[in-house]
C-alpha cells in the first residue's frame, strides 16, 4: 500500500502545517503509512512554532500527481485551494472547520467538519477518541494552530471548545499559552523582510462566490503602515495577480493584532462587490474595517452574500 499524503491548503498558515503534522502522526500510530507534506513556503509565525518545539517542516510538493494515490485533507476542502492534481487522487478523509464548497468525490469518505475556530481543536478530539497520547511537541504545534487561528483567543471564530483545547494542549506542551502565543504572533507580524509578492501570497485563498472568482489575502502586523507605505507597489502586484488568474476581485486585509482592526486594499474589475458587502465607499482602493480580524467569519460570508444577490 502506498504512502497516504496528509496536507492542508496552498499558501499554508500555522493550522495547515501543524495539523498536517499532528494528524499524520496520529494516523501513523494507528497503523497507516502516512506522511505530512506542504503546498507552499512556511511563514515566519509557523517557523517560530516549529523551531520552538523542535519539529521539522513537512516536505514541500508542487502536485500530488505522481506523489500519491490516496490523500487526506486538513484545514480545507475547496479544490482551488488544494494541491494541483487533486482531481486525480482518492481523498480518504477531510478534517476541516471551514465552509464546504467546490468539493466532490467519486467515492465515500470520512469527513469531519465542525464549527470551531481551528482544525487542531478537532484533532485533539480525534486523539482522545482513538485513545492515543499526544506527545509534547505535537501538543505544542496544535496549541500554536489554535493561537494563530484565534489571534490569541480574540477572534470571533474562537469558541469555548478552542479555549478549552488550548489550555489542555498548553499543559501537555509545558508552556504558558498567553506568553508563548504573543511571542509567536509577533514573529509572524514582522513583515520587514517580506517582498511585495510574498506579502500578497503569504496567506491567500481563492474562493468561488456565485459567478465571481475572488481571492482574499491577509497579513498580521502591529503597524498597518508597514504595508500601507508600500501601497502603490502592493496594488501593482495584486493587479498582476488579478490579470494572471482572471479574478473579479482581490481583497488584501492588513490586520493589526494589537487593535484588532483591518485595513483592506481592494483591486479588480468588481470593487462594487466589496463596497456592497461592507457598506463602505473605497477611497483610492482602501477601506478601514473596524473590529474585523477573521477572513472566515467576517469577510468571506459578506462577500459571498453580495456576490450571490
From Swiss-Prot:
<keyword id="KW-0464">Manganese</keyword>
<feature type="binding site">
    <location>
        <position position="149"/>
    </location>
    <ligand>
        <name>Mn(2+) 2</name>
    </ligand>
</feature>
<feature type="binding site">
    <location>
        <position position="75"/>
    </location>
    <ligand>
        <name>Mn(2+) 2</name>
    </ligand>
</feature>
<dbReference type="GO" id="GO:0004427">
    <property type="term" value="F:inorganic diphosphate phosphatase activity"/>
</dbReference>
<dbReference type="InterPro" id="IPR038763">
    <property type="entry name" value="DHH_sf"/>
</dbReference>
<feature type="binding site">
    <location>
        <position position="15"/>
    </location>
    <ligand>
        <name>Mn(2+) 2</name>
    </ligand>
</feature>
<keyword id="KW-0479">Metal-binding</keyword>
<dbReference type="GO" id="GO:0030145">
    <property type="term" value="F:manganese ion binding"/>
</dbReference>
<feature type="binding site">
    <location>
        <position position="75"/>
    </location>
    <ligand>
        <name>Mn(2+) 1</name>
    </ligand>
</feature>
<feature type="binding site">
    <location>
        <position position="97"/>
    </location>
    <ligand>
        <name>Mn(2+) 2</name>
    </ligand>
</feature>
<dbReference type="Pfam" id="PF01368">
    <property type="entry name" value="DHH"/>
</dbReference>
<dbReference type="Pfam" id="PF02833">
    <property type="entry name" value="DHHA2"/>
</dbReference>
<feature type="binding site">
    <location>
        <position position="9"/>
    </location>
    <ligand>
        <name>Mn(2+) 1</name>
    </ligand>
</feature>
<dbReference type="InterPro" id="IPR001667">
    <property type="entry name" value="DDH_dom"/>
</dbReference>
<protein>
    <recommendedName>
        <fullName>Probable manganese-dependent inorganic pyrophosphatase</fullName>
        <ecNumber>3.6.1.1</ecNumber>
    </recommendedName>
</protein>
<dbReference type="GO" id="GO:0005737">
    <property type="term" value="C:cytoplasm"/>
</dbReference>
<dbReference type="InterPro" id="IPR038222">
    <property type="entry name" value="DHHA2_dom_sf"/>
</dbReference>
<dbReference type="InterPro" id="IPR022934">
    <property type="entry name" value="Mn-dep_inorganic_PyrPase"/>
</dbReference>
<comment type="similarity">
    <text>Belongs to the PPase class C family.</text>
</comment>
<feature type="binding site">
    <location>
        <position position="13"/>
    </location>
    <ligand>
        <name>Mn(2+) 1</name>
    </ligand>
</feature>
<dbReference type="InterPro" id="IPR004097">
    <property type="entry name" value="DHHA2"/>
</dbReference>
<keyword id="KW-0963">Cytoplasm</keyword>
<keyword id="KW-0378">Hydrolase</keyword>
Amino acid at each position: 500500500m502506498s504512502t497516504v499524503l496528509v496536507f492542508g491548503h496552498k499558501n499554508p498558515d500555522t493550522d495547515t502545517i501543524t495539523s498536517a503534522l499532528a494528524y499524520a502522526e496520529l494516523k501513523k500510530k494507528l497503523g497507516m503509512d502516512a506522511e505530512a507534506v506542504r503546498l507552499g513556503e512556511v511563514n515566519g509565525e509557523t517557523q517560530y512554532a516549529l523551531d520552538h518545539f523542535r519539529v521539522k517542516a513537512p516536505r514541500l510538493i508542487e502536485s500530488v500527481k505522481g506523489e500519491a494515490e490516496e490523500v487526506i485533507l486538513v484545514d480545507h476542502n475547496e479544490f482551488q485551494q488544494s494541491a494541483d492534481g487533486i482531481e486525480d487522487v482518492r481523498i480518504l478523509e477531510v478534517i476541516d472547520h471551514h465552509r464546504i464548497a467546490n468539493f466532490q468525490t467519486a467515492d465515500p469518505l470520512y469527513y469531519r467538519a465542525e464549527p470551531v475556530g481551528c482544525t487542531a481543536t478537532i484533532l485533539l478530539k480525534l486523539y482522545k477518541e482513538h485513545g492515543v497520547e499526544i506527545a509534547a511537541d505535537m501538543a505544542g504545534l496544535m496549541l500554536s494552530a489554535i493561537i494563530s487561528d484565534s489571534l490569541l483567543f480574540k477572534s470571533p471564530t474562537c469558541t469555548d471548545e478552542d479555549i478549552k483545547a488550548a489550555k489542555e494542549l498548553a499543559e501537555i506542551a509545558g508552556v504558558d499559552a498567553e506568553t508563548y502565543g504573543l511571542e509567536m504572533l509577533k514573529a509572524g507580524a514582522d513583515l520587514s523582510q517580506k517582498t511585495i509578492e510574498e506579502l500578497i501570497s503569504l496567506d491567500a485563498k481563492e474562493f468561488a462566490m456565485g459567478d465571481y472568482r475572488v481571492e482574499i489575502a491577509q497579513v498580521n502586523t502591529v503597524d498597518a503602515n508597514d504595508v500601507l507605505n508600500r501601497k502603490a507597489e502592493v496594488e501593482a502586484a495584486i493587479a498582476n495577480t488579478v490579470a494572471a488568474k482572471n479574478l473579479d476581485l482581490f481583497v488584501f486585509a492588513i490586520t493589526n493584532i494589537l487593535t484588532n482592526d483591518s485595513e483592506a486594499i481592494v483591486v479588480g474589475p468588481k470593487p462594487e462587490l466589496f463596497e456592497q458587502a461592507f457598506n463602505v465607499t473605497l477611497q483610492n482602493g482602501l477601506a478601514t474595517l473596524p473590529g474585523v480580524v477573521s477572513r472566515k467569519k467576517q469577510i468571506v460570508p459578506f462577500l459571498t452574500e453580495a456576490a450571490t444577490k
